[in-house]
Amino acid sequence: MSFLKSFPPPGSADGLRLQQPDTEAVLNGKGLGTGTLYIAESRLSWLDGSGLGFSLEYPTISLHAVSRDPNAYPQEHLYVMVNARFGEESKEPFSDEDEDDNDDVEPISEFRFVPSDKSALEAMFTAMCECQALHPDPEDEDSDDYDGEEYDVEAHEQGQGDIPTFYTYEEGLSHLTAEGQATLERLEGMLSQSVSSQYNMAGVRTEDSVRTYEDGMEVETTPTVAGQFEDADVDH
């Protein structure tokens, strides 16, 4: 096929993990011949006896697995799915309508590597896993990034950026207006009365029911006594 090219086989400089001779390559059901499969850290390559072959970049490989299902293929093999077109079908002309229909369809090619020694399949699969792990999907990395607003350091140094201001509790109090402080004191008083009322309900309040109680801001209680207010609706 036209996409087969001549190139030197991967070596130690490419991080060669496994070299499997007598391996047949099949692309989308069409046999490419028998050659040597090279599983290296940099790429996956296959070369036939004449030195012609192809290489696959790991970021384009979406799936690899050992297939032992005779209904899928008569021989056990290493299955590799690639998000790209290869061979003559990659050069087929498309009409405008075909191009529109294919905009949302990602190209896919299926490779099958069939070694004469089927016992080598596990080693081939393991080498593929190790090399694939060295090339994580960029989209997966982007999804782990923080998606909030970014602080532009350069803009700030030039006096063009705004820095969000954060205060501690004490610093926040110092920035309150007189009206704001009065409102805060009123809210704290209401909270204190609410907590006091809650723990004097039914005339029961024990030292064990309170770990800390300072200005009505931090309270921890023991579980409700069985039979008392278990069916009460409480708005928080």
Swiss-Prot record:
Region Disordered, annotated ranges: 134-158
Keyword Cytoplasm: yes
Phosphothreonine: residues carrying this PTM: 222
InterPro entries in the record: ICln, ICln/Lot5/Saf5, PH-like_dom_sf
A single Gene Ontology CC term: cytoskeleton
Subcellular location field: Cytoplasm, Cytosol; Nucleus; Cytoplasm, Cytoskeleton
Disulfide bonds: none
Organs and tissues of expression: Expressed in most tissues.
Database matches in Pfam families: Voldacs
N-acetylserine PTM sites in chain numbering: 2
Acidic residues biased stretches: 138-152
Record keywords: Acetylation, Cytoplasm, Cytoskeleton, mRNA processing, mRNA splicing, Nucleus, Phosphoprotein
Primary localization class, coarse: cytoplasm
GO BP of this protein: cell volume homeostasis; chloride transmembrane transport; chloride transport; mRNA cis splicing, via spliceosome; negative regulation of cell volume; potassium ion transmembrane transport; spliceosomal snRNP assembly
GO molecular function, one term: potassium channel activity
UniProt family annotation: Belongs to the pICln (TC 1.A.47) family.
PANTHER family: CHLORIDE CONDUCTANCE REGULATORY PROTEIN ICLN, METHYLOSOME SUBUNIT PICLN
Subunit structure: Component of the methylosome, a 20S complex containing at least PRMT5/SKB1, WDR77/MEP50 and CLNS1A/pICln. May mediate SNRPD1 and SNRPD3 methylation. Forms a 6S pICln-Sm complex composed of CLNS1A/pICln, SNRPD1, SNRPD2, SNRPE, SNRPF and SNRPG; ring-like structure where CLNS1A/pICln mimics additional Sm proteins and which is unable to assemble into the core snRNP. Interacts with LSM10 and LSM11.
Functional summary from the UniProt entry: Involved in both the assembly of spliceosomal snRNPs and the methylation of Sm proteins. Chaperone that regulates the assembly of spliceosomal U1, U2, U4 and U5 small nuclear ribonucleoproteins (snRNPs), the building blocks of the spliceosome, and thereby plays an important role in the splicing of cellular pre-mRNAs. Most spliceosomal snRNPs contain a common set of Sm proteins SNRPB, SNRPD1, SNRPD2, SNRPD3, SNRPE, SNRPF and SNRPG that assemble in a heptameric protein ring on the Sm site of the small nuclear RNA to form the core snRNP (Sm core).
Identification of the protein by name: Methylosome subunit pICln
Gene that encodes the chain: Clns1a
